[in-house]
């Protein structure tokens, strides 16, 4: 990662709480985003495997409307040790209160869609190179460790952790620790924070 990319990403990270307060993200308006798909009991019984779907990337200029589900129709069960993080989540506690993200999972694959970007990773697979915060190019590897999804910058430095604690999703991103609740319906059915 180039020094300019690091400075750009660091500056964007420090300003993220202010950006979210000034421009609160909108939750997906269509109900299909909120449905948690049924997974097959075993990998052998799965009709579609996670690697049957092409890898998604952040589109040029980022997305402004929630993109379709990347793993729609995939029923491959989660790999052993993977926490079930699937769903649409909103931060209700922490510096990034209001943040909304959609997490899709199947097999070892996890797709995190939020803030105009799409991170499509395979835990234990090759690192993903895509756009990060502030437009900086990032190289990130995913690993399931101790019931957590950990993301490593350049496959070395742990920078993001997601795990379940009761019904909450705990998301640590850089210096920020946030608690998220699962949204089960489009915005008109969810109480404001």
Predicted regions and their residues:
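Short solvent-exposed loop/turn micro-motifs enriched in small/polar/acidic residues
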Residues: 95-96, 133-136, 144, 154-155, ...
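Mid-chain, well-packed structural core segment of small domains
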Residues: 138, 149-150
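Short, exposed beta-strand-loop hairpins at the edges of beta-sheets
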Residues: 168-175
